[in-house]
Design a protein with these regions (language model features):
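Ligand-binding loop in jelly-roll beta-barrel domains
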Residues: 120-128
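A short beta-strand-loop-beta hairpin characteristic of the jelly-roll/cupin
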Residues: 75, 91-111, 120
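Walker A (P-loop) ATP-phosphate-binding motif of ABC ATPase nucleotide-binding domains
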Residues: 114
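A generic local secondary-structure boundary/capping motif
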Residues: 19-21, 105, 128
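Histidine-centered active-site/metal-ligand motif
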Residues: 81-83, 99, 125
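Short loop/turn segments at secondary-structure transitions that flank enzyme active sites
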Residues: 38, 95, 123
Length: 128
């Protein structure tokens, strides 16, 4: 019965171009979109390309089609940092992302995987 009811209405409310950050109806929602085309990696798990033009530690300018973000030691991503009281949803279209947190949980997700993370007080995590 529920399936029949859903099939008679559209769940898509609108289609809009991407903006940064995503416009939302709620002040409690913050949406961002990263579409990086990272170059081949090197033996240290960093990009095998020049970092010239990249502002290490705060690189969001997307020079050459990719950014280091808050990456340290030549590895792009978001090193250990805390959150409290919100959730993040990460969809990996291509490539891989390594997650680790201060509770000892760790994992790798990629190529179509989705990560839904609920942030708790006193817990730090990293996505690299």
């Amino acid at each position: 019965m529920r399936t029949a009811a859903l099939s008679t209405m559209s769940t898509i409310l609108s289609v809009d171009p991407l903006s940064f950050p995503f416009a939302t109806d709620s002040p409690f929602l913050f949406g961002v979109h990263h579409d990086d085309r990272y170059p081949k990696g090197n033996a240290k798990m960093g990009p095998d390309a020049s970092l010239r033009g990249h502002s290490i530690g705060a690189d969001f300018g997307n020079p050459a089609g990719w950014s280091m973000y808050h990456g340290e030691g030549g590895v792009p991503g978001f090193p250990q940092h805390p959150h409290r009281g919100f959730e993040t949803i990460t969809v990996t279209v291509r490539g891989f992302i390594d997650h680790a947190d201060s509770l000892g949980a760790a994992g790798r997700f990629g190529d179509g995987d989705v990560q839904w993370m609920t942030a708790g007080a006193g817990i730090s995590h990293a996505e690299m």
